[in-house]
Amino acid sequence: MAANKSYKSYFLDPLWGNNQPLIAILGICSALAVTTTVNTAITMGLAVSFVTGCSSFFVSLLRKATPDSVRMITQLIIISLFVIVIDQFLKAFFFTISKTLSVFVGLIITNCIVMGRAESLARNVPPIPAFLDGLASGLGYGWVLVTVSIVREFFGFGTILGLQLIPKCFYASETHPDGYENFGLMVLAPSAFFLLGIMIWGVNILRSKKAKR
């Protein structure tokens, strides 16, 4: 497999052509909780990129020394190690965001993308391609989260990255009862699934049109 693909392909393919949330429909559950604001979406995307890239690298590095009978346990231990590292890093240097994300950083270990890349690719290719694939899979997951979070934060709160984009004077008040009001549905968890569904639908249309050419 490694001989047939360049490093560039290993990195670029998961960003779009084999994007895990949009193509494989993996890792979408966390979109419910972490896409309310762009800050949390970026943080979760980077955290998953770190865990997936590093765990894929070490799964690949140890692939020849790991018996098939214990490979899943070994992969889980490796993934858990890097989840703990990123969790402690966020608590030490980005406590506010860590508190906002709460248990969802720890739940990265249950993210299907992380185990999926380790099992389907990392144990079959050398460490560098495995790392590039894992890193890009996390980044591909990240940009999907950020896209969803931009829509949710803008319409739900009128902000992006905490910056007020919709002027306060536009909002409804006692003197202007007919003014703008935030779209409350976007703050609710189901809105993330609606937006992801629209994105998946759009990607499938683009892929089908490309296939017909």
Swiss-Prot record:
Entry's Gene Ontology cellular component terms: plasma membrane
Protein EC: 7.2.1.1
Catalytically driven reaction(s): a ubiquinone + n Na(+)(in) + NADH + H(+) = a ubiquinol + n Na(+)(out) + NAD(+)
Regions annotated as coiled coil: none
Regions that span the bilayer: 21-41, 42-62, 69-86, 101-121, 131-151, 183-203
One GO biological process term: sodium ion transport
Functional note: NQR complex catalyzes the reduction of ubiquinone-1 to ubiquinol by two successive reactions, coupled with the transport of Na(+) ions from the cytoplasm to the periplasm. NqrA to NqrE are probably involved in the second step, the conversion of ubisemiquinone to ubiquinol.
Protein name: Na(+)-translocating NADH-quinone reductase subunit D
Organism: Chlamydia caviae (strain ATCC VR-813 / DSM 19441 / 03DC25 / GPIC) (Chlamydophila caviae)
Underlying gene: nqrD
